[in-house]
C-alpha cells in the first residue's frame, strides 16, 4: 500500500456489536472489523449496556480494521460515526465515568414516565415540537429515569457536573479525550427534547422533565469537523471526526436519497422506512414519526419514519422457534416451492404492532390455515408478512406527504431474499431498487465525513458510487394485488380485536 492513498473510516456502533469499516474513494469496503458486547437485562423488558464496554469494543474494532488492511492511522482522512439511536448515557464530566448503565432504545423501564406525560396531556405539545409520539423509546424519559434513580444525580446535573449524550456524543467525547461534547441533528431529533422546527433544545420540555440544560451536548450539522482524535485514542493519529448520523438516517444518506419523495427501507431485525420530505417539516397525522433526515451545507432535510418491530426476526422465529428452516437463507427456496394461492396470513405481532397501528397489546396470529397447508406455505406467508407491513407504512407516507412514491430503495439482510423483494414490488406496485453496496449505514457515515473534508467534492459525485445493484419490477395485476392486501388488513384487524381487553 502506498502511504499516499487516503481512506475514510466509518464507526458503526450498533445494538449488539460495534464495527469499524475502511472505505476507499470509490466507496468500496477495504477492511472491516466487528466485535459483539454484552447485553444487560436487569429485569423483564429492561435492556442496558455498559458504556465503557461499548467504548472498549470501538477501540478494539478500530485496531482490527488497521491490522486487517495494513493501513496506518495517518492514511485516514476523516472518521464518520453512525450509531444505535436513542440509547442514553449520563457520565461524570471530570472522571469520564458513566453514573449508570446506558439505557438502550428497546428498554421499557421508563414506560411509567411516558405514561404519566400522556396522562398529563402533553401529547400534542411534544408532537408539534419534536415530531415524535410520547414513548419510552426516546431518550428524554431515560435521562429522567437515571436522574431519579442515581442518588444525588439531579443535584450534580444542576451544578454542571454531569453530561448526557446519545452514543454518538459518548464516542466523540471519548475519541477527543473529553474535549468535545456534541451531537448531530439526526440524533438530537430522537431525544424528545429537541425542537426540530426551531433547531434547538426545547426549554418547555426540559422544564417539564426537570432536565438541566447544562448536561446537553451542542447540536451540529451531520457533516462538519467536530474535533480531532487524541493520538492516544487513535493509535497515534490525529484525525478529524467530520460526519455523524443515527443509523437509519445514515442509511438514508448512504442510499443517496437526497431528493424529496425518495424512500429507503432497511430490512433488519425490524424494518425502518424513512422518506426524505425536503426542507419542509411535515407533521404526520397518521402515527408516523416526523424527524430530521440530515442537515448539510446549511440546509436541513426533514423526514417521515415508520418502524416495523418484526421483519428479519420473523425469519429467525421460523428457524429458532418453530425449527421449520435450518438457515435464514433457506426460507427463499421453501417459499418458492409453495403451491398455495397465498390464502395464509401470518401477522407477526410478537411484541405488538408498530407504525401505523402502534398497538402494544396485539400478539402474533395466523389466518387461513386448511388441512392442505404445508410448511412451504407457512414460510411463504411469513415472508409476505414483512412486505405487507412495509405497504402499511408506505401507504401512510403517501397520505401524510401527498407525494406519490415511485421507488423504494432497500438494504439490510432480508433485502437479499429475491422472492421477498419481488413480492414487495408486486404488493406495492412500484420498483424496488436494491443497492449494489448493502453497507449503506456505514457508507452514509463515511460519505458525510468525506464530504466535509473534501475527500469527495459534492453530493453529485457520490451518486456514481452506490448504484442500484438490482431492480425488481411489479408484475402482479391490480385486482389480485388489492385482493391480497385486503386479506392482510382483515387479518390485522382480527388480531387487534383478539387482543382487546374483555
Curated annotation (Swiss-Prot):
Domain of life assignment: Bacteria
Assembly: Homotetramer and homodimer (in equilibrium).
Pathway: Polyol metabolism; glycerol degradation via glycerol kinase pathway; sn-glycerol 3-phosphate from glycerol: step 1/1
GO CC terms of this entry: cytosol
Family classification: Belongs to the FGGY kinase family.
Pfam families found in the cross-reference section: FGGY_C (PF02782), FGGY_N (PF00370)
Annotated binding of ATP, by residue: 15-17, 269, 312, 316, 413
Catalytic activity: glycerol + ATP = sn-glycerol 3-phosphate + ADP + H(+)
Positions of modified residues (Phosphohistidine): 233
CDD domains xrefs: FGGY_EcGK_like
Name this polypeptide is given: Glycerol kinase
Keywords tagged on the record: ATP-binding, Glycerol metabolism, Kinase, Nucleotide-binding, Phosphoprotein, Transferase
Post-translational modification: The phosphoenolpyruvate-dependent sugar phosphotransferase system (PTS), including enzyme I, and histidine-containing protein (HPr) are required for the phosphorylation, which leads to the activation of the enzyme.
Enzyme class: transferase
Keyword set includes Protein transport: no
Keyword Nucleotide-binding included in the entry's annotation: yes
MF term (GO), any: glycerol kinase activity
Residues engaged in binding sn-glycerol 3-phosphate: 15, 85-86, 137, 247
Binding site for ADP: 15, 19, 269, 312, 413, 417
Binding site for glycerol: 85-86, 137, 247-248
Membrane spanning residue stretches: none
Biological process per Gene Ontology, one example term: glycerol catabolic process
Regulation: Activated by phosphorylation and inhibited by fructose 1,6-bisphosphate (FBP).
Role, per record: Key enzyme in the regulation of glycerol uptake and metabolism. Catalyzes the phosphorylation of glycerol to yield sn-glycerol 3-phosphate.
Naturally occurring in which organism (per UniProt): Streptococcus agalactiae serotype V (strain ATCC BAA-611 / 2603 V/R)
EC number: 2.7.1.30
Amino acid at each position: 500500500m502506498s502511504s499516499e492513498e487516503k481512506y475514510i473510516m466509518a464507526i458503526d456502533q450498533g445494538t449488539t456489536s460495534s464495527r469499524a469499516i475502511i472505505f476507499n474513494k470509490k466507496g468500496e469496503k477495504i477492511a472491516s472489523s466487528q466485535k459483539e458486547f454484552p447485553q444487560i437485562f436487569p429485569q423483564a423488558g429492561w435492556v442496558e449496556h455498559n458504556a465503557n464496554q461499548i467504548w472498549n469494543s470501538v477501540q478494539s474494532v478500530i485496531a482490527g480494521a488497521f491490522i486487517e488492511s495494513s493501513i496506518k492511522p495517518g492514511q485516514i482522512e476523516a472518521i464518520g460515526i453512525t450509531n444505535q439511536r436513542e440509547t442514553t448515557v449520563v457520565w461524570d464530566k471530570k472522571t469520564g465515568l458513566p453514573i449508570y448503565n446506558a439505557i438502550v432504545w428497546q428498554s421499557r423501564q421508563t414506560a411509567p414516565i411516558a405514561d404519566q406525560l400522556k396522562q398529563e396531556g402533553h401529547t400534542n405539545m411534544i408532537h408539534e415540537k419534536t415530531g415524535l409520539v410520547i414513548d419510552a423509546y426516546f431518550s428524554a424519559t431515560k435521562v429522567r429515569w437515571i436522574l431519579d434513580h442515581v442518588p444525588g444525580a439531579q443535584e450534580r446535573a444542576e451544578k454542571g457536573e454531569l453530561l448526557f449524550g446519545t452514543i454518538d456524543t459518548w464516542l466523540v467525547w471519548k475519541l477527543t479525550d473529553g474535549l468535545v461534547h456534541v451531537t448531530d441533528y439526526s440524533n438530537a431529533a430522537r431525544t424528545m427534547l429537541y425542537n426540530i422546527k426551531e433547531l434547538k433544545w426545547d426549554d418547555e420540555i426540559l422544564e417539564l422533565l426537570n432536565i438541566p440544560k447544562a448536561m446537553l451536548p451542542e447540536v451540529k450539522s451531520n457533516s462538519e469537523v467536530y474535533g480531532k482524535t487524541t493520538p492516544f485514542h487513535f493509535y497515534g493519529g490525529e484525525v478529524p471526526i467530520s460526519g455523524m448520523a443515527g443509523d437509519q438516517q445514515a442509511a438514508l444518506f448512504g442510499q443517496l436519497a437526497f431528493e424529496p419523495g425518495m424512500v429507503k427501507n432497511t430490512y433488519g431485525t425490524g424494518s425502518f422506512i424513512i422518506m426524505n420530505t425536503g426542507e419542509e417539516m411535515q407533521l404526520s397525522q397518521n402515527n408516523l414519526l416526523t424527524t430530521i433526515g440530515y442537515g448539510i451545507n446549511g440546509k436541513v432535510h426533514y423526514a417521515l419514519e415508520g418502524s416495523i418491530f418484526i421483519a428479519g426476526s420473523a425469519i429467525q422465529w421460523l428457524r429458532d422457534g418453530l425449527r421449520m428452516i435450518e438457515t435464514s437463507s433457506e426460507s427463499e427456496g421453501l417459499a418458492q416451492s409453495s403451491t398455495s394461492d397465498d390464502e395464509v396470513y401470518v401477522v407477526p405481532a410478537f411484541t405488538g404492532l408498530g407504525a401505523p397501528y402502534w398497538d402494544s397489546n396485539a400478539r402474533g396470529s395466523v389466518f387461513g390455515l386448511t388441512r392442505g397447508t404445508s410448511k412451504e406455505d407457512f414460510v411463504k406467508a411469513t415472508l409476505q408478512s414483512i412486505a405487507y407491513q412495509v405497504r402499511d407504512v408506505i401507504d401512510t407516507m403517501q397520505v401524510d406527504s401527498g407525494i406519490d412514491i415511485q421507488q423504494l430503495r432497500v438494504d439490510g439482510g432480508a433485502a437479499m431474499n429475491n422472492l421477498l423483494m419481488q413480492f414487495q414490488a408486486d404488493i406495492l406496485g412500484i420498483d424496488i431498487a436494491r443497492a449494489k453496496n448493502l453497507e449503506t449505514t456505514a457508507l452514509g457515515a463515511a460519505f458525510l465525513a468525506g464530504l466535509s473534508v473534501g475527500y469527495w467534492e459534492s453530493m453529485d459525485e457520490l451518486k456514481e458510487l452506490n448504484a442500484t445493484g438490482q431492480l425488481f419490477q411489479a408484475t402482479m395485476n391490480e385486482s389480485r394485488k388489492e385482493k391480497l392486501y385486503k386479506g392482510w388488513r382483515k387479518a390485522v384487524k382480527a388480531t387487534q380485536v383478539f387482543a382487546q381487553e374483555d
